[in-house]
């Protein structure tokens, strides 16, 4: 196999997005568009990858890190000019170079591999990825000769009436003999309506020099969608969502209503897990097997163990063990670690807490900045009072502790193993192991008080 290189064009400003966010960084199913492209081209066995950046260069570099080298297009003068900015990295290399736009998040490695194979088998100097569509308005047209060979690519704005009738379009993805590409770029003119240096002109230059120019027509037109505005962004989101949902269902995940279920591109879900309508799974979430998620549940950047149930709840940046029950209407906030066989019930909020195996907070509780042992029962209305208006403090609850209903644990405080806290207590000091702590006013019953009060009011 000859050397393979790729150039990703990601320098466009994206004016039509009408956004402060750089265009190729807009997410599709939770991942920036350009990251989708990089993830796919990285499967092609590349020797070098160069991303051409312009507006928002630093943000793109931060997103992609050391996966790619970068070239700066300080002034946007067209796609040929953009590719030429990679000359310092690639111009002297022998091999095949793939050129693709950073705003095509739906492209797959399989389609690009097919393009590269067509290029190799045809012995071509250039091969363009094309598609056939009924309404090609706005796309460059593929002009072929009487033998069906590619002659040139004409941009929509420069096409004549005959060329506008062509329905085979340029998708903006190409592969070239690397040295032929960079030798041809200097020959590209900007004598066109836009006054730009078009990369498709390289096709005509190579053809006129007698080189073989090939085309690979994909049947997956959706993959070639370029995102230039919010409408196209929403279209890409829907297509990617359906693709992700289908992949999960094929792999053994039950999705009750795929049209109302959203799974990020990087999420991993085990077999025989059921997702109910309104479920949103974001970021790098990993969900085990035999789980039941939803309805109306959001999980972000979290790890969920096998056989866990989460109903109408939110889990962020946390880890849950196996056979955990969460919800309905619970909120597990970042940096929480929930053990196995735990119950987090309705209207319970847990934040930055380690919650031990088989422990439970069944309803109406707030547990923050705490370490909760195993086999602990937190009664209804249990509160860790962790904030004094300036600093956060830790509550430690040992194994086998029983906290009665409507109790406040004022941190920093420790309740040792096996201790009991009576209902209605406000605990401000440590509770020894196996002690009963009662911290509430003693009940006083005043006999016949009501009759005396009512008689007094009558008089």
Curated annotation (Swiss-Prot):
Names of required cofactors: Mg(2+)
Enzyme category, top tier: transferase
Span list, region N-acetyltransferase: 252-459
Assigned GO CC terms: cytoplasm; membrane
Family matches, as InterPro entries: Bifunctional_GlmU (IPR005882), GlmU-like (IPR050065), GlmU_C_LbH (IPR038009), Hexapep (IPR001451), Hexapep_transf_CS (IPR018357), NTP_transferase_dom (IPR005835), Nucleotide-diphossugar_trans (IPR029044), Trimer_LpxA-like_sf (IPR011004)
Pathway involvement of the protein, from the record: Nucleotide-sugar biosynthesis; UDP-N-acetyl-alpha-D-glucosamine biosynthesis; N-acetyl-alpha-D-glucosamine 1-phosphate from alpha-D-glucosamine 6-phosphate (route II): step 2/2; Nucleotide-sugar biosynthesis; UDP-N-acetyl-alpha-D-glucosamine biosynthesis; UDP-N-acetyl-alpha-D-glucosamine from N-acetyl-alpha-D-glucosamine 1-phosphate: step 1/1; Bacterial outer membrane biogenesis; LPS lipid A biosynthesis
Alphabetized Gene3D superfamilies for the sequence: Hexapeptide repeat proteins, Spore Coat Polysaccharide Biosynthesis Protein SpsA, Chain A
Protein name: Bifunctional protein GlmU
Originating organism: Bacillus cereus (strain G9842)
């Amino acid at each position: 196999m000859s050397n393979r290189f790729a150039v990703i064009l990601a320098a466009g400003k994206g004016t039509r997005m009408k956004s402060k966010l750089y265009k190729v960084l807009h997410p599709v199913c939770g991942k920036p568009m350009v990251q989708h492209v990089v993830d796919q081209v990285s499967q092609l066995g590349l020797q070098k990858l160069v991303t051409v950046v312009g507006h928002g260069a630093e943000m793109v570099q931060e997103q992609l890190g050391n996966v790619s080298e970068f070239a700066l297009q300080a002034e946007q003068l067209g796609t040929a000019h953009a590719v030429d900015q990679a000359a310092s990295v690639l111009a002297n290399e022998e091999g095949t170079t793939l050129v693709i736009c950073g705003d095509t998040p739906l492209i797959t490695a399989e389609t690009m591999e097919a393009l590269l194979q067509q290029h190799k088998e045809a012995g071509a100097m250039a091969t363009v990825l094309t598609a056939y569509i009924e309404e090609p308005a706005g796309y460059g047209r593929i002009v072929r000769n009487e033998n069906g060979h590619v002659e040139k690519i004409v941009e929509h704005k420069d096409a004549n009436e005959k060329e506008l009738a062509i329905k085979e379009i340029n998708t903006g993805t190409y592969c070239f003999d690397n040295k032929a590409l960079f030798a041809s770029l200097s020959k590209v003119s900007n004598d066109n309506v836009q006054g730009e240096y078009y990369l498709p002109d390289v096709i005509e230059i190579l053809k006129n020099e007698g080189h073989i120019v090939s085309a690979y027509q994909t049947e997956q037109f959706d993959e070639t969608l370029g995102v230039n505005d919010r409408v196209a962004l929403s279209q890409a989101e829907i297509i990617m969502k359906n693709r992700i949902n289908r992949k999960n269902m094929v792999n053994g995940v039950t999705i009750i209503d795929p049209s109302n279920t959203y799974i990020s591109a990087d999420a991993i879900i085990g077999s025989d897990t059921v997702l109910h309508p309104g479920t949103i799974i974001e970021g790098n979430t990993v969900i085990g097997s035999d789980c039941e998620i939803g309805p109306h549940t959001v999980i972000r950047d979290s790890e969920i163990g096998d056989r866990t149930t989460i109903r109408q709840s939110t889990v962020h940046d946390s880890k849950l063990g196996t056979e955990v029950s969460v919800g309905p209407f619970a909120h597990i906030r970042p940096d929480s670690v929930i053990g196995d066989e735990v119950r987090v019930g309705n209207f319970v909020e847990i934040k930055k807490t380690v919650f031990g195996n088989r422990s439970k907070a069944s309803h109406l509780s707030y547990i923050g900045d705490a370490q909760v042992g195993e086999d602990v029962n937190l009664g209804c209305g249990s509160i860790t009072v962790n904030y004094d208006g300036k600093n956060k403090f830790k509550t430690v609850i040992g194994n086998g502790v029983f906290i009665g209903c409507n109790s406040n644990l004022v941190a920093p405080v420790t309740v040792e193993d096996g201790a009991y806290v009576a209902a209605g207590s406000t605990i401000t000091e440590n509770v020894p192991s196996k002690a009963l702590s009662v911290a509430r006013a003693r009940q006083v019953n005043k006999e016949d008080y009501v009759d005396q009060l009512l008689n007094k009011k009558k008089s």
